UniProtKB/Swiss-Prot annotation:
Source organism of this protein record: Xanthomonas campestris pv. campestris (strain ATCC 33913 / DSM 3586 / NCPPB 528 / LMG 568 / P 25)
Known function: Binds to DNA and alters its conformation. May be involved in regulation of gene expression, nucleoid organization and DNA protection.
Protein name: Nucleoid-associated protein XCC1002
Gene Ontology MF annotations: DNA binding
Localization: Cytoplasm, Nucleoid
Gene3D superfamilies: Nucleoid-associated protein YbaB-like domain
Amino acid sequence: MRGNIAQLMQQAQKMQENLQRAQEELAKLEVTGSAGGGMVSVTLTGAKECRKVRIDPSILSDQEMAEDLIAAAFNDASNKIDAESKERMGSATAGMQLPPGMKLPF
């Protein structure tokens, strides 16, 4: 019985180390989302901080369209980060599922 507990503790510690490493890698990650066939692009970090916005000058005359495309590009980048985070955290937890509603990184 004690051997099982010790083994579980070792596995938990290794998983924690893997999670921390994955979080550090995600923080360095930069992802670009785009919209309007590339007329707008938004680059976010893994922490979802905006690093760059590129807007094709041809859409600036239509404010509503520009706003919609910026939002769509941001959402595209955000979704890519979520997918990458899920993949990396899944690898770090060895596929162990988290309870519903719990997201990583915490």
